[in-house]
Design a protein with these regions (language model features):
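Short, exposed beta-strand/loop patches in secreted or surface proteins that constitute
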Residues: 1, 31, 79-83, 161-168, ...
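Short, solvent-exposed loop/turn segments enriched in Ser/Thr/Gly
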Residues: 54-60, 96-104
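GH16 jelly-roll
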Residues: 9-10, 91-92, 98-99, 107, ...
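Solvent-exposed, low-complexity, repeat-rich "mucin-like" stalks and linkers
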Residues: 32-71, 117-121, 125
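A recurrent domain-boundary module in secreted/ectodomain proteins
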Residues: 10-35, 388-401
């Protein structure tokens, strides 16, 4: 019988019984014995708050013990789920509408009470990821701490340590400090964990809670095939060593093989009347406070927003081999920075943003020419007491239909 506590009890001292509920699932319920019980504790699950996402398995690592058998007694139409030895897996029907959904799991241990677990999830067919950083650490299904020192300016001082990227007070805190004679900075990346295809939109609520001269921070989305194939910086900001104008603004930009092989590496500028900078900037009220930074990537344009207001756009100006820009482009030349570039080979690669899958990165960094400093790591001036912080309240990644 089912007791007032919702558990199933058996009255007789036999090995067990099987029965069928009107859900068509066959379930087993053994005799209850003292000292044994079912344990099922999913990680990253908060009732009525946790999302599940369409088009992929949603894995909730779980402590599962003393479970002899388990069956799902209630699932939304078209949904699938399974309980494994160390995880709960939920697969929504991609045709489901946005809303709240519930699944029920009947589990029992040998000689124990049978328990019914109810899990309540949120589902949005357009949503790829929502993370409010409400736990005690990053969700390692989607994020890892970055410590790949590949020589790029922003990665100079990345430690990969939790001390530089803790989760606390409902936010991801990225810290840049100078201690023990060295700079230490934090970054978190979704590389090799969660990637998504265009068209998409990324929204991120973030704040520069502590600023120092020479610090800079960014939220960006990067092609899985490499930064040069369409990196999009959703927001960048920092304290310039000399320019108060730079410091007062937030910045956004995109990179592609074409712009990286123009003399200035900045402009779509081969055709009169169609020049468009790859970068933009804006002055925000109370720039250190929380703002929502966004980007939309479609076949027509990459468009940036701050608090819902458009601040820049890079359009898909379709290049062809009939353009004079292609006909008269040099095979190779030298950029304003003294680097060898290849304009002709890359002329047609000005809008690769629809060709790649992307992942997200958050970071805080120190030094480099971006903030008016040196591009030599060992020459970044030491600043005792340096303590900058960039806080991420939440990130939302969505499909665009």
């Amino acid at each position: 019988y089912i007791g007032a506590d919702g558990r199933v009890y058996f009255r007789y001292s036999t090995k067990g019984m099987t029965f069928r509920r009107n859900t068509i699932y066959d379930l087993g319920a053994p005799v209850e014995k003292a000292g044994t019980s079912v344990v099922l504790e999913p990680k990253y699950y908060t009732e009525g708050v946790s999302y599940v996402y369409g088009g992929r398995e949603n894995i909730f690592p779980a402590v599962v013990s003393d479970v002899t058998d388990a069956s799902f007694t209630s699932l939304p139409d078209g949904w699938r789920a399974r309980l494994e030895k160390d995880r709960l897996v939920v697969i929504p029907d991609t045709e489901s509408e946005r809303g709240n959904y519930e699944i029920q799991l009947f589990a029992y241990a040998e000689g124990a009470k049978a328990d019914i677990y109810t899990f309540r999830f949120k589902y949005d067919p357009a949503l790829i990821l929502y993370d409010g950083f409400d736990g005690s650490d990053i969700d390692d299904r989607y994020w890892r701490r970055f410590n790949d020192h590949h020589g790029t300016l922003w990665s100079w001082f990345q430690t990969g340590d939790e001390a530089q990227s803790p989760v606390a007070d409902g936010k991801l805190q990225l810290k840049a400090v100078y201690e023990d004679g060295a700079y230490k900075t934090g970054a978190v990346t979704g590389q090799n964990l969660l990637d998504y295809e265009p068209p998409f939109r990324v929204d991120c609520r973030a704040a520069m809670s502590r600023r120092e001269t020479g610090f800079w921070c960014a939220v960006w989305t990067v092609p899985t095939t490499g930064y040069q194939n369409g990196e999009i910086d959703i927001m960048e900001a920092g304290n310039h060593y000399t320019s108060s104008d730079f410091t007062s603004k937030i910045h956004c930009t995109c990179h592609n093989p074409y712009t990286l092989n123009t003399p200035s590496k900045k402009y779509e500028g081969f055709r009169p009347g169609q020049d468009q900078p790859q970068s933009g900037s804006a002055v925000l009220d109370n720039p250190n406070d929380y703002h929502i930074y966004s980007v939309e990537v479609t076949d027509e344009a990459v468009t940036w927003y701050a608090d819902g207001v458009q601040i820049h756009q890079y359009k898909n100006i379709r290049h062809t081999t009939d353009d004079n820009g292609y006909k008269y482009a040099a095979e190779s030349t030298t950029s304003s920075a003294g680097e060898t570039i290849y304009p002709k080979a890359n002329y047609l690669k000005n809008y690769p943003f629809m060709e790649n899958r992307y992942f997200a990165i958050f970071d805080i960094a120190v030094g480099s020419s971006f903030v008016g400093g040196t591009n030599k790591k060992d020459e970044v001036p030491a600043t005792e007491g340096f303590n900058a912080q960039f806080d991420i309240d939440w990130i939302k990644i969505s499909k665009i239909k």
